[in-house]
Amino acid sequence: MEQFHGTTIVSVRRGDKVALGGDGQVTLGNIVMKGGARKVRRIYNNQVLVGFAGGTADAFSLLDRFEAKLEKHQGNLTRAAVELAKDWRTDRMLRRLEAMLITADATTTLVITGNGDVLDPEGGICAIGSGGAYAQAAARALVENTDLSPREIVEKSLGIAGDMCIYTNHNRIIETIE
């Protein structure tokens, strides 16, 4: 059976502000199943942003586990991400999950990959999902050549990804921490 997939999640950090946004499209094979899915959320007393891409059920499973780690480590984003990655590498069930997360708080942005790696993005810009490369390239160009806010950059980057990637639409949800 085919999995639900396809999305774009992008994060931009500039100064003391961070924005994380995603589109709303969910596809099953070549069929759009939903156009308004919410793949970006606030967790841990609204102090942490998280966006997910990949198989929907897998992403929700990882999100639940990440939230539990965040609670256990009292909101320490890096510690929670590393502990989740350790579990991901050692737990047979988790190793089969096909999803990625971008997490951000007031000071740190991290990508948690499908291999159980934790990456600190270079330049405060990261993107995942089917339109991630388009969004990341657009965000990098905008960061280097404009004075736009992180929210504006995320919005424009998602728009460009939505124009180019058939698995990404223009229904955007963007969250910020300032």
Curated annotation (Swiss-Prot):
Domain of life according to the entry: Bacteria
Reaction(s) catalysed by this chain's protein: ATP-dependent cleavage of peptide bonds with broad specificity
Active site per UniProt: T7
Pfam families in the cross-refs: Proteasome (PF00227)
Keyword Metal-binding annotated: yes
PROSITE patterns: PROTEASOME_BETA_2 (PS51476)
GO cellular component: HslUV protease complex; proteasome core complex
Key words of the record: Allosteric enzyme, Cytoplasm, Hydrolase, Metal-binding, Protease, Sodium, Threonine protease
EC number: 3.4.25.2
GO molecular function terms listed in the Swiss-Prot or TrEMBL record: metal ion binding; threonine-type endopeptidase activity
Known function: Protease subunit of a proteasome-like degradation complex believed to be a general protein degrading machinery.
Subunit details: A double ring-shaped homohexamer of HslV is capped on each side by a ring-shaped HslU homohexamer. The assembly of the HslU/HslV complex is dependent on binding of ATP.
Family designation: Belongs to the peptidase T1B family. HslV subfamily.
Protein name per Swiss-Prot or TrEMBL: ATP-dependent protease subunit HslV
Species for this entry: Burkholderia cenocepacia (strain ATCC BAA-245 / DSM 16553 / LMG 16656 / NCTC 13227 / J2315 / CF5610)
